[in-house]
Amino acid sequence: MAIQAQKGTKDMLPNDAYKWHYIEEKLRKISAEYGIREIRTPMFEATELFKRGVGETTDVVQKEMYTFEDKGGRSITLKPEGTAPAVRAFIENSLYADAQPTKMFYFTPCFRYEKMQKGRLREFHQYGIEVFGSQEASIDAEILSLVMRALTEDFGIKGLSLNINSLGCPKCRAKFNEALKQYLKENYDNLCETCKTRFEKNPMRIIDCKEKRCKEIVKEAPSILDYICEECSDHFSKLKAYLDVMGIEYNIDPQIVRGLDYYSKTVFEVIKDGLTVCGGGRYDYLVEEVDGPKTPAMGFGLGLERLLLILDEEGIEIPEPVRCEVYIGSMGDNAKLEAMKLAFNLRKAGIKAEIDHLGKSVKAQMKYANKIGAKYTFVIGDSEIEENKIKIKRMSDGEQFEVSLDINEIVNIVK
């Protein structure tokens, strides 16, 4: 049996690569508009980073990570998300010593061993933003404005819902967790086994459980917004005011807790037809948790596979770039030499040029040129070389003409 791609992975073929380039270019552009610069972190990290950063009781750490021991006996994990590695890089490279806030974005593959679903594979790709050094609600609103602008204006997606919540600070959550435990007590026996463990260690994680029975139980659970302190409530009010002044619509959803333990205060999700397009929030204690200085932070992740799926389902076309501007057909060895020289010079002038590498007949060459969408076809033979001329056909209307083999004249025609 032939070796195949592993379950949960997918090849990105040349016919699809331009779609990825398109969305990455759009996201790079809007990142630059907000003064956000790129970071690249390794594909694998110490397992301890994710245990401490993401949270021991999360599904990600308990069930989904690709973890192995390397030849040096170190526990290594393929990164399941982008925030913890960005935090590690922020600390290790002393970026906290720079002028704050520090704004960074990334494109990264992530790996999670989870049940595959629409738009989600075991190897998937994320665009993420992390902002360090500001505790102000204004930075949260700024990042949310970027998200909604990118999705609605740059990509033209309709029917999106921005849902926000506040998880408060550790003191708020302690009060909420007690109230939540009191509520869950009478349904304890109906919880899944994982949530029974969470009941004592981290009851708020039960709200994020994907099991149907647990989802039903938490529908009427207390709202954390009834337990946040005055400072956290003020932060949430300011966030809403900033969103209002920018004209960004939102819904308040007290059941958004996100699947990772590091979140505090603001959390959000962008929903389309019941699926989460992207999500994130504030994590003011994570940098300190992984041995850095006390640093407030905010970030989010956007799944690129899911984004491409939505664009396809919405019928939003991604413009396909011209693959070949000039195809140079040749007859004979001398003509092939001239074709090679001409293609080289056209490429130097920034023109996409192709020649025959299979020894095809001129008819077959022209058929191939049409198949790859060449805008112009050239034909060179011995007579053209002797007369220092070349035959050109404009494929859009079929017009044919002869011009000198002078590269400057040819460039002026096809550009």
Swiss-Prot record:
Belongs to the class-II aminoacyl-tRNA synthetase family. One of its GO terms (molecular function) is histidine-tRNA ligase activity. Its main location: cytoplasm. One of its GO terms (biological process) is histidyl-tRNA aminoacylation. This is Histidine--tRNA ligase. It holds the Pfam family HGTP_anticodon. Homodimer. It catalyses: tRNA(His) + L-histidine + ATP = L-histidyl-tRNA(His) + AMP + diphosphate + H(+). GO terms for cellular component: cytoplasm. CDD domains: HisRS-like_core (cd00773), HisRS_anticodon (cd00859). PROSITE patterns: AA_TRNA_LIGASE_II. Keywords: Aminoacyl-tRNA synthetase, ATP-binding, Cytoplasm, Ligase, Nucleotide-binding, Protein biosynthesis. It is found in: Cytoplasm. Its EC number is 6.1.1.21. The keyword Isomerase does not apply.
